[in-house]
């Protein structure tokens, strides 16, 4: 497992964080032998903004045919720079991650509204998703990002990508980080670990 210390907004807005992640992937491929990596099991993973970067990196790698990924693991990911969803309307405030906070995040990461429409910023806007690695999504129901996460899972399935989606009713954004407080958080972490084990045993 390699954790990428990518540079972050607002000091380093798009595309710098994504470039850092993709550079790390390329480095892993070029130095696989010395790092002891099995390239047949190379995957990307991330939660929230990290989920956005993981999904975007998978899109870029597939488009440029630079790196072949085994899978992508997206935990309550950001998949579109749009606030016009049922989840944003329903959970705009009072449920942890708020509409106002997400608007601020987007202003720091991608200030230009036109650039936000690009697929590497909003993976849900990708014109093609065929050929992407199988995807595993873990979504919190009471999360402003729930609808876009579900929509991305649907888009991938319709594009012929193998998808597994787990939805956790009543959970808030980032709930896996609070597994000490939520039984469902512990359950989700356990299920994620089992999914990882199963997926890579057959790789």
Could you say what each language-model-derived stretch is?
Residues 1-203:
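Alpha/beta-hydrolase superfamily serine-hydrolase fold, recognizing
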């Amino acid at each position: 497992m390699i954790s990428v210390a990518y540079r972050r907004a607002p000091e380093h807005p798009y595309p710098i964080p994504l470039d850092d992640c993709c550079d790390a992937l390329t480095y892993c491929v070029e130095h696989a032998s010395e790092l002891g990596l099995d390239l047949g099991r190379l995957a990307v993973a991330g939660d929230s903004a990290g989920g956005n970067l993981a999904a975007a990196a998978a899109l870029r790698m597939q488009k440029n045919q630079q790196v072949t990924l085994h899978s992508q693991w997206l935990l309550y990911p950001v998949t579109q720079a749009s606030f016009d969803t049922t989840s944003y309307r329903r959970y705009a405030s009072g449920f942890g991650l708020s509409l106002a906070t997400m608007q601020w995040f987007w202003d720091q990461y991608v200030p230009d509204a036109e650039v936000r429409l690009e697929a590497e910023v909003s993976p849900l806007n990708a014109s093609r998703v065929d050929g992407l690695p199988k995807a595993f999504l873990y979504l919190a129901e009471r999360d402003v990002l729930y609808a876009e996460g579900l929509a991305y899972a649907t888009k991938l399935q319709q594009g012929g990508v193998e998808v597994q989606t787990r939805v956790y009713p009543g959970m808030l954004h980032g709930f896996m980080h609070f597994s000490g407080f939520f039984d469902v958080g512990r359950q989700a972490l356990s299920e994620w670990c089992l999914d990882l084990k199963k997926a890579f045993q057959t790789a």
